[in-house]
Regions:
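Aromatic- and Gly/Pro-enriched helix-to-coil junctions and flexible linker segments
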Residues: 32-170, 274-280
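Short acidic/polar inter-strand loop motif in beta-rich domains
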Residues: 121-125, 284-288, 409-418
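A surface-exposed loop-and-adjacent beta-strand signature within N-terminal beta-sandwich domains
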Residues: 73, 77-78, 86-101, 197-262
């Protein structure tokens, strides 16, 4: 630009140079995709394949399948509309605060391209250069699973507008002891299944004849003794003692996509005989009867897990108190917080903010002993439907003696369209209830004790 202004003073002499500059500029602009008429081939396919197709293909949650040009162009106007108003792709975390793996986020220019494409009639473009649609494994996060276990019985969800809490046992028997690299949970009913916390039961050699003993689906009554439930499920060894239980090997919340760590991080030992225990299987209220038969997919590893991950829950049912106690008065917007202090230096892998329907916003951060703040996650507009386990691109290193803090704002007024009560009622934590209409405030973190070099590990795949 400076060059241009200078030349302007001596117009005659500068004119050919200016023409030359203009020519270069035109060539440059026309070779630059962004200003070109967006077509399916030159721009739209790659945007949709990255940000939409993972959930919009057969067997996935998104209803519409967006794989071929026909499927995508047919819905160009709808795609333009849902992206313009920010409804899709679903990514509640503020990317200006912290960044994660596998973000579903459109840049301003991608957003504009989708609008422009729809307005101009969704052209295909150069049909010889259509990008290949991405390869996905049906119903699967990555390659073919080594073991697929389905709930032995489908759960009939009665349409009585009441929350339901179940425990399912998925027994298995394999050829020999092995290692688990990753576990994937595929809900059979994504509309109604709100939560699941999966544990792994391992029977030592010779301790259990028939892993299928007992009931496979039991209602989880909050007041019933847990041991009684475990006995009904036939979890005990043949001598009546209980086998080892590895807690929280897999968790599900609305929209969660399973996390897969690089080899060497996470993973579990898996004995020849055992069972997955799907606890806290929580189905939201529905007026229409429905059913669920969820599936667990297991990916075996070759090596023993070197660095098992640790999980910590802050807040409701967790290790730190919610302050003030989580009681949300009607017709008010109120704020709560919870925090812990780290007793060792840690490498933080994932964070999962969890609230229910009254959630309005959420913020998680760490404060180092020297006073510096490490931003962890910020959700400016809470959305109950998308509660990812956000995975950092690289572990976030948090020094020993840091405070890990979470702040949640709840909107218990009539202006919250998700408020389950009209007029609003006092809502809060109730005993150990996890009903959708009661509230929870949790910040779940997964981490490793720090090791030198952790800051350079890539968690992307
Ligand atoms: C993480 C999964 C996920 C991603 C990524 C995603 N969607 Fe969706 N989408 C869904 C689900 C699930 C629904 C069903 C609606 C619901 O339950 O809220 C949906 C619904 C829709 C609908 C139907 C809206 C209606 O009114 O019926 C459209 C259109 C849509 N998505 C377009 C897109 C587009 C375009 C993208 C990419 C820019 C995208 N989605 C990315 C999961 C996803």
């Amino acid at each position: 630009m400076i060059f241009f202004i200078k030349e302007k003073q001596n117009f005659k002499k500068g004119f050919p140079v200016f023409l030359c500059f203009l020519f270069v500029l035109v060539v440059f602009l026309s070779s630059c995709n962004n200003s070109e008429q967006p077509t399916f081939t030159n721009r739209i396919a790659s945007i949709v394949y990255k940000n939409c197709t993972p959930c919009h293909r057969s067997g996935e949650a998104g209803g519409y399948s967006f794989v071929t040009y026909e499927e995508i162009s047919k819905h160009a106007d709808l795609i333009a509309a849902v992206t313009k108003d920010g409804y899709m792709p679903p990514w509640p975390a503020d990317t200006a605060y912290s960044r994660f793996c596998d973000e579903f986020v459109l840049t301003q220019s991608e957003l504009q391209a989708l609008q422009l494409w729809a307005e101009s009639g969704a052209p295909l473009g150069d049909e010889n250069n259509i990008p290949k649609s991405p390869e996905f494994f049906v119903d699967s996060i990555h390659e073919k699973p080594d073991l697929i276990l389905k709930m032995t019985k489908s759960f009939f969800i009665k349409g009585d507008n009441a929350d339901k809490f179940m425990i399912a046992k998925l027994p298995y028997e394999i050829a020999h002891d092995t290692f688990i690299r990753a576990i994937e949970f595929v809900p059979g009913n994504r509309k109604l299944l709100h939560h699941m916390n999966g544990h792994l039961v391992s029977y030592p050699e010779g301790k259990k004849k028939n892993v299928s003993d007992g009931e496979h689906l039991v209602e989880m009554n909050m007041d019933t003794d847990q041991i009684l439930i475990y006995q009904r499920l036939g979890l005990q060894n043949d001598d009546g003692t209980f086998p080892a239980l590895t807690p929280s090997v897999i968790n599900y919340l609305p929209g969660v996509i399973s996390t897969v760590y690089p080899e060497g991080i996470g993973g579990y030992r898996m004995s020849k005989k055992g069972a997955f225990l799907l606890k806290d299987l929580h189905y939201g209220p529905t007026p229409v009867s429905d059913s669920d038969q969820s599936v667990i997919k297991v990916y075996f590893g070759n090596k023993p897990p070197k660095r098992p991950t640790n999980e910590l829950i802050l807040g409701t049912l967790g290790v730190s108190e919610v302050l003030p106690p989580l009681q949300i008065p009607p017709d008010e917007v109120s704020s709560f917080s919870t925090e812990i202090t780290t007793t060792e230096k840690i490498s933080l892998l994932t964070v999962n903010p969890h609230l229910h329907l009254l959630g309005k916003s959420f913020k998680g951060y760490a404060i180092k002993p020297n006073g510096d703040t490490i931003p962890l996650v910020r959700i400016n507009k809470w959305d109950f439907r998308w509660q990812y386990f956000y995975t950092y691109k690289k572990p976030v290193i948090i020094p020993k003696g840091s405070r890990i803090c979470a702040e949640a704002v709840f909107d218990n007024t009539t202006s919250n369209p998700n408020n389950p009560f009209s007029p609003p009622r006092q809502v809060g934590e109730r005993n150990t209830s996890m009903r959708t209409t009661d509230e929870m405030f949790q910040f779940i973190i997964t981490f490793l004790p720090y090791r030198r070099g952790d800051e350079n590990i890539s968690l992307e795949h």
